[in-house]
Amino acid sequence: MPELPRLLTFDQLTEICRGTPPRRVEPFLSPLNHYLHVYEINTPPRVAAFLAQICHESGNLRWTREIWGPTPQQARYEPPSPLARRLGNTETGDGHNFLGRGLIQVTGRYNYAQVSVALAQDFVANPTLLEQPLWATASACWFWSTRGLNPMADESTEDAYRRITRRINGGLNGWADRLEKWRRIQAILGIESRPRVAKK
């Protein structure tokens, strides 16, 4: 992995991921500093919004795999449900095989195929690769970029961050935690807070 200017230090990342042992945080530092550049998540407002979201989704880098019940929602990952069709799950067992993995959970055969093309790795044949720090990070940065979230992060307002959350989550689940993380990471990265809505 080529060396690029660091966007994050180890001390910053461990402070951001408070409660997570440093030995669990360290494997993510190099992939983050690389893929944040690759996907142009490379300014303090972009980094803050991205990290706040992935820290919420992954429990401060503790989890890279969806906890499987299966819950009633997860049972709908299996064909022939409408949700399974949307996820591209066509074969029995696809729901469990293609459960959410990565720092922003990639879910479903279709999305695994898409990220396989983007990252030149066969995650359909080897889905657990997305649990590894390198690919968990790369897939999250890919997801962020493909959903057009950098321009929203540039606004650096609460309303823009709310729109980012909706685009990632489909709603506002965990909003209070996502917002608290965003504000705290902004402070760690030295970003001044802006009004809730940008001035026209």
Located regions from the model:
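Peptidoglycan-targeting cell-wall enzymes and recognition modules
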Residues: 2-26, 52-143
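N-terminal carbohydrate-binding/catalytic regions of secreted carbohydrate-active enzymes
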Residues: 16-48, 168
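Non-transmembrane alpha-helical segments in soluble domains
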Residues: 33, 51, 140-141, 165, ...
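Short, mixed-charge amphipathic alpha-helical segments
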Residues: 37-42, 125-131, 156
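Extracellular/periplasmic catalytic domains that process cell-envelope and extracellular macromolecules
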Residues: 42-46, 96-99, 135-136, 158-161
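Acidic helix/loop microenvironments that form the catalytic cleft of cell-wall polysaccharide enzymes
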Residues: 54-57, 152-174
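Proteins synthesized as precursors that undergo proteolytic processing into mature forms
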Residues: 135-139, 146-155
